[in-house]
UniProtKB/Swiss-Prot annotation:
Subcellular location: Nucleus
Other information: There are three genetic loci for mating type genes in S.cerevisiae. MAT is the expression locus that determines the mating type of the cell, whereas HML (containing HMLALPHA1 and HMLALPHA2) and HMR (containing HMRA1 and HMRA2) represent silenced repositories of mating type information. The mating type is determined by the MAT locus, which contains either a copy of HML or of HMR. Diploid cells are usually heterozygous for the MAT locus.
Record protein name field: Mating-type protein ALPHA1
GO molecular function, one term: DNA binding, bending
Quaternary state and interactors: Binds DNA with a high specificity in complex with an MCM1 dimer. Interacts with STE12.
Stimuli inducing this protein: Repressed in a/alpha diploid cells by A1/ALPHA2.
Its biological purpose: Mating type proteins are sequence specific DNA-binding proteins that act as master switches in yeast differentiation by controlling gene expression in a cell type-specific fashion. Transcriptional coactivator that, in alpha-cells, binds cooperatively with MCM1 and STE12 to a DNA sequence termed the QP' element, to activate the transcription of alpha-specific genes.
Length: 175
């Protein structure tokens, strides 16, 4: 039953640390700029002079009002968030998350599953707004103010502001 031979054989492989890590000849011959794709960089766009928070469409607001009436809730006020309960998220905000965070305040009194479908429908209805919300999300992620997106957005973009110059990052960090 017992044998002196092993039941299996281990095959020795070359360690990854011994692999050739030198730069290939092709890369040495060409400039580095030719190998770098522009999509690798996160470019923060300058503040735009004329950018404003998009107003929700009347169709969207009418649908929300219909669902409020159907559910028996006539609460038309925006949700008030408790500032102590908002925690700064480590996750990066994308354009749809920014859109959803801002527009969901118009749907207070509507069930969450209904509101989610209305927001998704509104998002797909107007593709021109995607760039604006992407801009807001990039700015928020870059600045990382330490408080909620909706509060940051209303503080910074409720009115047209700025002269279109590049943002001074240190000013935002000091705030």
């Amino acid at each position: 039953m017992f044998t002196s031979k092993p039941a299996f054989k281990i095959k020795n492989k070359a360690s990854k640390s011994y692999r050739n890590t030198a730069v290939s000849k092709k890369l040495k011959e060409k400039r580095l700029a030719e190998h770098v794709r522009p999509s690798c960089f996160n470019i923060i766009r300058p503040l735009k002079k004329d950018i404003q928070i998009p107003v929700p469409s009347s169709r969207f607001l009418n649908k929300i009002q219909i669902h409020r009436i159907a559910s028996g809730s006539q609460n038309t006020q925006f949700r008030q968030f408790n500032k102590t309960s908002i925690k700064s998220s480590k996750k990066y905000l994308n354009s749809f998350m920014a859109f959803r965070a801002y527009y969901s305040q118009f749907g207070s009194g509507v069930k969450q599953n209904v509101l989610s479908s209305l927001l998704a429908e509104e998002w797909h209805a107007d593709k021109m707004q995607h760039g604006i919300w992407d801009y807001f999300a990039q700015q928020y992620n870059f600045i990382n103010p330490g408080f909620g997106f909706v509060e940051w957005l209303t503080n910074n973009y409720a009115e047209v502001r700025g002269d279109g110059y590049w943002e001074d990052v240190f000013v935002h960090l000091a705030l």
